[in-house]
């Protein structure tokens, strides 16, 4: 793997290609990456993908997995959190707990307007249907994340997305390009059982709200407890959408999304 075409790839060259050309160029590399363990994938990415390496985390139910995995290979990697101001109190305490336990290099980014200012100007966007939710996400998650990637001069962005989590993630590759940076998903093929065994093996905890019936945790106003008959996707954003926008390509300036 270390001697494959992967080690010769340059981000600037890939950005000059069309989306289809990018996918084809990365196809062989992704096939090889699928054969590696998650830790081997992370180490490969650190060695072969250029630019500052960062990892994003919402500090959700299974957040400890990705944070532990990546910091094993690079202890000081910047950990990006987009803080909306509407996270659960348990989430803020979980952030403090993991930051201390794993000695995280936490980098917190927030919207340019405070939550109170936004409500005064727009009302409660999360109650305004799909358009309101998308505007809310753009203001509080997408823009702060783009700013984080720019300010940290990120070239490679690690994320803990998994195919099992939703239909929108079912066909994601390990390596892609999103909005001008490498996007790397080392646990994309892991199951919930894989995650559980990893956390157990390394003495790591789930988010505390898991014990109260939450499968996924985001903001207080767009997260529901799981009830019989619900899918995980239906516990977020009133079931109107699964993605908050962070993991979607804007499709304007750059080619391949995920």
UniProtKB/Swiss-Prot annotation:
Pathway: Sulfur metabolism; hydrogen sulfide biosynthesis; sulfite from sulfate: step 3/3
Keywords, comma-separated and alphabetical: Cytoplasm, Oxidoreductase
Oxidoreductase listed as a keyword: yes
Cell compartments where the protein resides: Cytoplasm
Protein's name in the database: Phosphoadenosine 5'-phosphosulfate reductase
UniProt-listed GO biological process terms: hydrogen sulfide biosynthetic process; sulfate assimilation, phosphoadenylyl sulfate reduction by phosphoadenylyl-sulfate reductase (thioredoxin)
Gene3D superfamilies linked to this entry: HUPs
Domain of life: Bacteria
Keyword check for Transport: no
Assigned protein family: Belongs to the PAPS reductase family. CysH subfamily.
GO cellular component term of the entry, any: cytoplasm
Catalytic activity: [thioredoxin]-disulfide + sulfite + adenosine 3',5'-bisphosphate + 2 H(+) = [thioredoxin]-dithiol + 3'-phosphoadenylyl sulfate
Native source organism of the sequence: Vibrio atlanticus (strain LGP32) (Vibrio splendidus (strain Mel32))
Gene Ontology terms, MF aspect: phosphoadenylyl-sulfate reductase (thioredoxin) activity
Active site: 244
Top EC class, one word: oxidoreductase
């Amino acid at each position: 793997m270390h001697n494959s075409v992967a080690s010769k790839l340059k981000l600037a060259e890939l950005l000059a290609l069309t989306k289809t050309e990018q996918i084809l160029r990365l196809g062989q590399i992704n096939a090889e990456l699928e054969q590696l363990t998650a830790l081997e994938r992370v180490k490969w990415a650190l060695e072969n993908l250029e630019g500052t390496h960062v990892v994003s985390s919402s500090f959700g139910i299974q957040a400890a997995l990705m944070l532990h995995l990546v910091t094993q290979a690079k202890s000081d990697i910047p950990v990006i959190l987009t803080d909306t101001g509407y996270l659960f109190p348990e989430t803020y305490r979980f952030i403090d707990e993991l930051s201390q336990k794993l000695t995280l290099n936490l980098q917190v980014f927030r919207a340019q307007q405070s939550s109170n200012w936004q409500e005064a100007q727009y009302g409660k966007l999360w109650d305004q249907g799909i358009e309101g939710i998308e505007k809310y996400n753009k203001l509080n998650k997408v823009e702060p994340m783009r700013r984080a990637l720019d300010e940290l001069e990120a070239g490679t962005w690690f994320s803990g997305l998994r195919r099992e989590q939703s239909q929108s993630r079912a066909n994601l590759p390990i390596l892609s390009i999103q909005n001008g940076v490498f996007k790397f998903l080392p646990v994309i093929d892991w199951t919930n059982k894989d995650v559980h065994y990893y956390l157990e093996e390394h003495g790591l905890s789930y988010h505390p709200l898991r014990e109260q019936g939450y499968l996924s945790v985001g903001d207080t106003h767009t997260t529901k407890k799981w009830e019989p008959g619900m899918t995980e996707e239906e516990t977020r954003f009133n079931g109107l959408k699964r993605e908050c926008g962070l993991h979607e390509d804007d499709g304007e300036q750059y080619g391949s999304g995920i």
